[in-house]
From Swiss-Prot:
Any single Gene Ontology cellular-component annotation: cytosol
Gene: cmk
Keywords recorded for this protein, A-Z: ATP-binding, Cytoplasm, Kinase, Nucleotide-binding, Transferase
Name of the protein in its database record: Cytidylate kinase
Lineage, broadest ranks: Bacteria, Bacillati, Bacillota, Bacilli, Bacillales
Protein location: Cytoplasm
Catalytic reaction(s) noted: CMP + ATP = CDP + ADP; dCMP + ATP = dCDP + ADP
Length: 224
Protein backbone atom coordinates (compact mmCIF):
# COMPACT_ATOMS: atom_id res chain seq x y z
CA UNK A 1 0.00 0.00 0.00
CA UNK A 2 1.37 3.43 -0.99
CA UNK A 3 2.16 5.72 1.94
CA UNK A 4 -0.19 8.70 1.69
CA UNK A 5 1.99 11.76 2.06
CA UNK A 6 1.03 15.40 1.50
CA UNK A 7 2.90 17.28 -1.24
CA UNK A 8 2.88 21.10 -1.21
CA UNK A 9 3.86 22.94 -4.40
CA UNK A 10 4.24 26.71 -4.18
CA UNK A 11 5.46 29.38 -6.55
CA UNK A 12 4.54 32.57 -8.40
CA UNK A 13 1.98 32.97 -11.19
CA UNK A 14 2.52 30.85 -14.32
CA UNK A 15 5.45 28.91 -12.84
CA UNK A 16 3.79 25.67 -13.95
CA UNK A 17 2.44 24.64 -10.54
CA UNK A 18 -0.98 23.38 -11.58
CA UNK A 19 0.20 21.49 -14.66
CA UNK A 20 2.98 19.75 -12.74
CA UNK A 21 0.79 19.08 -9.69
CA UNK A 22 -1.84 17.36 -11.85
CA UNK A 23 0.78 15.07 -13.43
CA UNK A 24 2.33 14.20 -10.06
CA UNK A 25 -1.08 13.48 -8.50
CA UNK A 26 -2.13 11.30 -11.43
CA UNK A 27 1.10 9.26 -11.38
CA UNK A 28 0.89 8.71 -7.61
CA UNK A 29 -2.90 8.24 -7.68
CA UNK A 30 -3.22 11.07 -5.18
CA UNK A 31 -5.95 13.73 -5.08
CA UNK A 32 -5.08 17.08 -6.65
CA UNK A 33 -6.31 20.21 -4.87
CA UNK A 34 -6.12 23.39 -6.96
CA UNK A 35 -6.14 26.17 -4.36
CA UNK A 36 -5.70 28.80 -7.05
CA UNK A 37 -9.04 27.71 -8.49
CA UNK A 38 -10.61 28.30 -5.09
CA UNK A 39 -9.40 31.92 -5.00
CA UNK A 40 -10.51 32.33 -8.60
CA UNK A 41 -13.93 30.94 -7.66
CA UNK A 42 -14.29 33.53 -4.90
CA UNK A 43 -13.23 36.27 -7.33
CA UNK A 44 -15.88 35.01 -9.75
CA UNK A 45 -18.66 35.13 -7.14
CA UNK A 46 -17.68 38.73 -6.36
CA UNK A 47 -17.86 39.55 -10.08
CA UNK A 48 -21.17 37.72 -10.51
CA UNK A 49 -22.73 39.55 -7.55
CA UNK A 50 -21.36 42.99 -8.53
CA UNK A 51 -19.30 43.21 -5.34
CA UNK A 52 -16.15 45.33 -5.45
CA UNK A 53 -12.99 43.22 -5.32
CA UNK A 54 -11.70 45.47 -2.52
CA UNK A 55 -14.78 44.87 -0.32
CA UNK A 56 -13.43 42.17 2.00
CA UNK A 57 -16.46 41.97 4.31
CA UNK A 58 -18.98 41.64 1.47
CA UNK A 59 -16.91 38.96 -0.28
CA UNK A 60 -16.47 37.07 2.99
CA UNK A 61 -20.25 37.14 3.51
CA UNK A 62 -20.72 35.68 0.02
CA UNK A 63 -18.09 33.00 0.68
CA UNK A 64 -19.89 31.87 3.83
CA UNK A 65 -22.88 30.98 1.61
CA UNK A 66 -20.76 29.34 -1.08
CA UNK A 67 -19.84 25.69 -1.58
CA UNK A 68 -16.73 25.13 -3.71
CA UNK A 69 -16.05 21.58 -4.80
CA UNK A 70 -13.91 19.67 -7.27
CA UNK A 71 -14.94 16.80 -9.50
CA UNK A 72 -12.18 14.55 -10.86
CA UNK A 73 -11.85 13.89 -14.57
CA UNK A 74 -9.49 14.26 -17.50
CA UNK A 75 -9.88 17.98 -16.78
CA UNK A 76 -10.76 18.58 -13.14
CA UNK A 77 -14.11 20.37 -12.88
CA UNK A 78 -14.72 23.20 -10.42
CA UNK A 79 -18.20 23.90 -9.07
CA UNK A 80 -19.53 26.91 -7.16
CA UNK A 81 -22.92 26.14 -5.61
CA UNK A 82 -23.34 23.45 -8.31
CA UNK A 83 -22.54 25.85 -11.17
CA UNK A 84 -19.68 24.54 -13.29
CA UNK A 85 -17.18 27.42 -13.32
CA UNK A 86 -14.17 25.51 -14.67
CA UNK A 87 -13.74 27.75 -17.71
CA UNK A 88 -15.14 31.07 -16.51
CA UNK A 89 -12.72 31.31 -13.56
CA UNK A 90 -9.86 31.38 -16.09
CA UNK A 91 -11.26 34.48 -17.81
CA UNK A 92 -9.07 37.57 -18.08
CA UNK A 93 -11.39 39.52 -15.77
CA UNK A 94 -10.92 36.96 -12.99
CA UNK A 95 -7.20 36.52 -13.70
CA UNK A 96 -6.55 40.25 -13.47
CA UNK A 97 -8.30 40.65 -10.11
CA UNK A 98 -7.73 37.40 -8.20
CA UNK A 99 -4.65 38.78 -6.40
CA UNK A 100 -6.77 41.59 -4.92
CA UNK A 101 -9.30 39.11 -3.53
CA UNK A 102 -6.58 36.68 -2.41
CA UNK A 103 -4.90 39.43 -0.36
CA UNK A 104 -7.89 39.74 1.99
CA UNK A 105 -7.01 38.07 5.34
CA UNK A 106 -10.59 36.89 5.96
CA UNK A 107 -10.74 35.16 2.57
CA UNK A 108 -7.33 33.51 2.98
CA UNK A 109 -8.23 32.28 6.46
CA UNK A 110 -11.56 30.83 5.34
CA UNK A 111 -10.10 29.06 2.32
CA UNK A 112 -7.06 27.79 4.23
CA UNK A 113 -9.44 26.07 6.68
CA UNK A 114 -11.25 24.38 3.79
CA UNK A 115 -7.93 23.35 2.22
CA UNK A 116 -6.71 21.80 5.47
CA UNK A 117 -9.89 19.70 5.65
CA UNK A 118 -9.14 18.34 2.16
CA UNK A 119 -5.68 17.23 3.37
CA UNK A 120 -6.67 15.39 6.56
CA UNK A 121 -6.43 11.93 4.99
CA UNK A 122 -3.12 12.55 3.19
CA UNK A 123 -2.50 11.33 -0.35
CA UNK A 124 -2.89 14.81 -1.81
CA UNK A 125 -0.96 17.20 -4.01
CA UNK A 126 -1.85 20.83 -3.32
CA UNK A 127 -0.48 23.84 -5.17
CA UNK A 128 -0.70 27.53 -4.44
CA UNK A 129 1.18 30.46 -2.93
CA UNK A 130 1.25 29.59 0.77
CA UNK A 131 0.73 25.84 0.98
CA UNK A 132 4.08 24.93 2.51
CA UNK A 133 4.12 27.91 4.88
CA UNK A 134 0.50 28.37 6.02
CA UNK A 135 -1.86 25.64 4.75
CA UNK A 136 0.24 22.47 5.13
CA UNK A 137 3.27 23.45 7.23
CA UNK A 138 3.77 19.76 8.11
CA UNK A 139 3.63 18.44 4.53
CA UNK A 140 6.17 15.65 4.00
CA UNK A 141 7.37 17.17 0.72
CA UNK A 142 7.46 20.88 -0.08
CA UNK A 143 8.44 22.21 -3.50
CA UNK A 144 8.96 25.84 -4.49
CA UNK A 145 8.89 26.40 -8.26
CA UNK A 146 10.58 29.36 -9.89
CA UNK A 147 10.87 30.66 -13.46
CA UNK A 148 11.83 33.96 -15.06
CA UNK A 149 9.12 36.54 -15.76
CA UNK A 150 9.83 36.17 -19.51
CA UNK A 151 9.40 32.40 -19.38
CA UNK A 152 6.19 32.63 -17.37
CA UNK A 153 4.72 35.29 -19.67
CA UNK A 154 5.50 33.09 -22.68
CA UNK A 155 3.78 30.11 -21.05
CA UNK A 156 0.70 32.15 -20.15
CA UNK A 157 0.61 33.62 -23.67
CA UNK A 158 0.58 30.13 -25.20
CA UNK A 159 -2.10 28.99 -22.75
CA UNK A 160 -4.30 31.96 -23.64
CA UNK A 161 -3.84 31.42 -27.38
CA UNK A 162 -4.76 27.74 -26.99
CA UNK A 163 -7.97 28.81 -25.22
CA UNK A 164 -8.80 31.31 -27.95
CA UNK A 165 -7.93 34.41 -25.91
CA UNK A 166 -6.14 37.21 -27.70
CA UNK A 167 -2.99 38.21 -25.88
CA UNK A 168 -0.18 40.72 -25.81
CA UNK A 169 3.11 39.28 -24.57
CA UNK A 170 4.44 42.56 -23.17
CA UNK A 171 1.18 43.20 -21.36
CA UNK A 172 1.34 39.70 -19.86
CA UNK A 173 4.86 40.38 -18.59
CA UNK A 174 3.61 43.54 -16.92
CA UNK A 175 0.62 41.73 -15.37
CA UNK A 176 2.84 38.93 -14.03
CA UNK A 177 5.26 41.44 -12.50
CA UNK A 178 2.33 43.23 -10.84
CA UNK A 179 0.93 39.93 -9.60
CA UNK A 180 4.33 38.94 -8.20
CA UNK A 181 4.50 42.23 -6.31
CA UNK A 182 1.04 41.69 -4.79
CA UNK A 183 1.77 38.06 -3.91
CA UNK A 184 5.17 38.67 -2.33
CA UNK A 185 4.20 41.81 -0.40
CA UNK A 186 0.69 41.12 0.92
CA UNK A 187 0.47 41.21 4.71
CA UNK A 188 -1.42 37.94 5.24
CA UNK A 189 0.31 34.71 4.07
CA UNK A 190 2.58 36.26 1.41
CA UNK A 191 4.22 34.11 -1.23
CA UNK A 192 7.50 32.84 0.18
CA UNK A 193 9.56 29.68 0.19
CA UNK A 194 9.20 27.49 3.28
CA UNK A 195 12.49 26.89 5.08
CA UNK A 196 12.33 23.15 4.34
CA UNK A 197 11.08 23.47 0.74
CA UNK A 198 13.14 22.26 -2.21
CA UNK A 199 13.59 25.00 -4.81
CA UNK A 200 13.23 24.03 -8.48
CA UNK A 201 13.98 26.59 -11.20
CA UNK A 202 11.83 25.49 -14.15
CA UNK A 203 13.03 28.16 -16.60
CA UNK A 204 14.94 25.75 -18.84
CA UNK A 205 12.97 22.59 -17.95
CA UNK A 206 10.06 20.91 -19.69
CA UNK A 207 6.89 20.12 -17.74
CA UNK A 208 7.74 16.40 -17.79
CA UNK A 209 11.24 17.07 -16.47
CA UNK A 210 9.84 19.07 -13.56
CA UNK A 211 7.18 16.45 -12.82
CA UNK A 212 9.73 13.62 -12.91
CA UNK A 213 12.02 15.47 -10.51
CA UNK A 214 9.16 15.93 -8.04
CA UNK A 215 8.04 12.31 -8.48
CA UNK A 216 11.57 11.14 -7.68
CA UNK A 217 11.60 13.24 -4.51
CA UNK A 218 8.12 11.98 -3.59
CA UNK A 219 9.13 8.34 -4.01
CA UNK A 220 12.00 8.89 -1.57
CA UNK A 221 9.58 10.32 1.00
CA UNK A 222 7.07 7.51 0.44
CA UNK A 223 9.71 4.82 0.94
CA UNK A 224 11.17 6.35 4.11
Amino acid sequence: MTKKICIAIDGPAAAGKSTVAKIVAKKLRFVYIDTGAMYRAVTYIALKNNVAYEDEMAIDALLKKTVIRFEPGEVQQVFVNEENVTDVIRSLEVTNHVSIVAAHPAIREALQERQQVFATEGGIVMDGRDIGTAVLPNAELKIFLLASVEERAERRYKENMAKGFAGDLNQLKKEIEERDHLDYTREHSPLKKANDAIEVDTTSMSIDEVANKILSLAEQKIQN
